[in-house]
Amino acid sequence: MTSENTYRVGVGINYWDDPKGLIKILTNDTVYDYVEKIYVIDGRYEGRMDEAESHMDYLTDLSEIYSKLHIVSMDGSKQIAKRNKYWELAQVDEMDYMIVCDSDEYMDFDVTKLIGSLRTLDARPEKCYPVKQHMEGISVMSRPRLFKGPFTFRHLQSEKDNTISHGSLYEKDGTEIINQMYAWFKDHPKRQINSDDQSGIDGIKMWHDKTFRSRDRVIADRVYYDETP
């Protein structure tokens, strides 16, 4: 925590060629003013051949406007390497908490409630917590999006061909991190999927929104994730 008794909260964004989605995150003043740093890990994945649909200088232009952006170029890297980069940076910068919010997602805070929630989490041993996320017109569910430091864990490559690699997150001693989210549900019962009464952390909500991506890009994304663990 800082000397002002506030938390150092960072945001980790896995990004490529999605400036409108990123702008949706950055232009929420409540979110931008509260967080300490926004780590944008830029780059097209290894093995993807689709071309960018927007001008690649957009990201540079945004970094000149939004000083909290910390941009790292990792073009040609695997998803797992890109996601591990923001954990590495959060560890170096000694963030207290991290929120994972990709560029096809956005979020909103009630800062007073969020700070109260983070104080509650300080006393808990788990490092992963659920956030209520909406996919408009499709589903509402609690997802692992809030993480507590120290950020000594990393994603490990899955041994199963049909498992997305960033779903595996482990400490060096083999402790699994994502599953720690379920400890929250023991005293905050999990709700039915699509129920608006999801038991996520109070003070933060997220939305999944692909409307800024073209139909071709959404299809290319789906094909890539289906074929690449």
Question: For the regions a protein language model found, what residue spans apply to each?
Answer:
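Short, conserved active-site loop motifs that form the nucleotide-linked donor/cofactor pocket
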Residues: 9, 67-70, 126, 175
